[in-house]
Amino acid sequence: MGNYQDECHLKEIHQLAEEFERCRKLLLALGDENRQHLILEMMRMGQCEGVRVGAITEKTNLSRPAVSHHIRILKEAGLLKVRKEGTKNYYYFDADTEAMDRLLQMLAHAKEIMEHRPERK
């Protein structure tokens, strides 16, 4: 019976690994300290219509190219969108809820596996 439990547990672990892989872009975007700081500063600025790179640069200790780099990663992860007004770009939060749902499901699955993992001897 122990073999069957181990096989079931391994299947769960492999499924979790696949779920984790699907969440990597979002995890990488959120996992960087500079991007976390950038997100917090944008939230503190609280401008629903969007924020320009220059305004973010003023609030952080990051250069303009660094802010642009981090914004690109956050956009690719589905956390930010851009609104264009002529030549001006305004960045705002508009998260990809499907990506967030996948992340929440992956975390719930990981918790479930940890709560029901086989006992070690």
Give short role names for the model-derived ranges:
Residues M1-C23, L40-R44, Y92-K121:
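Amphipathic alpha-helical dimerization/coiled-coil segments
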Residues E21-S63, T87-A99:
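N-terminal helix-turn-helix DNA-binding core of bacterial DNA-binding proteins
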Residues L40, H69-H70:
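Base-recognition residues in the alpha-helical recognition helix of bacterial helix-turn-helix
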Residues T57-E58, H69, K75-E76:
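Alpha-helical residues within the helix-turn-helix
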Residues T60, I71, L107, K111:
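Short amphipathic alpha-helical/adjacent loop interface patches that line ligand
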Residues A66:
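Conserved H-loop
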Residues K75-G86, Y92:
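Beta-hairpin "wing" of winged helix-turn-helix
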